Amino acid sequence: MSSSLSQTSKYQATSVVNGLLSNLLPGVPKIRANNGKTSVNNGSKAQLIDRNLKKRVQLQNRDVHKIKKKCKLVKKKQVKKHKLDKEQLEQLAKHQVLKKHQQEGTLTDHERKYLNKLIKRNSQNLRSWDLEEEVRDELEDIQQSILKDTVSTANTDRSKRRRFKRKQFKEDIKGSDFVKDHRYPGLTPGLAPVGLSDEEDSSEED
């Protein structure tokens, strides 16, 4: 009963307000009796929209943080790679200079010691360096060439020493007054031993 009176009172009050509005402000939309419920619904929708907007902002901030972190890591890797590439290119240039000095025979003692160490750890360096395939192949070719030239130079020196010794031996023989027959000491080649005539040689052969 009270609910019905309340609804009636609301309706009457709404009618009075609508009448006043139509007189004072013609064209203004009339107020509906259930306007309070509509306001409540609109308030709930506003709160829901606000919550969704806040969540969206939080997600965006989180994504921005992830993007910044990822960009920072990428930049750090690029700087590290650039530094490594620079060191490797400097190393390659140094090896090329050493190769040139090796071919020209102008290696210093310091360069020679460095080459010996370089050849020993050649395989380890090639595995640890993060080079492009072309640069790695170039380094390996240079080091193999240096090793080959070093071995070839040592073999050439030994061969020269052997040829010199043979030449010296022949010159010593030619410089002697006469060459003794090793079968008959005291005789020169072509002479028969004492007590052995040509006839005896013939009879022994028969």
From Swiss-Prot:
Residue list for modification Phosphoserine: S197, S202, S203
UniProt-annotated stretches for the region Disordered: 178-206
Annotated Pfam families: RRT14
Cellular-component GO terms for this entry: nucleolus
Key words, A-Z: Nucleus, Phosphoprotein, Transcription, Transcription regulation
Annotated signal peptide: none
Subcellular location: Nucleus, Nucleolus
Positions with biased composition (Acidic residues): 197-206
Function recorded in the entry: Involved in ribosome biogenesis, probably through modulation of rDNA transcription.
Family of the protein in this entry: Belongs to the RRT14 family.
Protein known as: Regulator of rDNA transcription 14
UniProt source species: Saccharomyces cerevisiae (strain YJM789) (Baker's yeast)
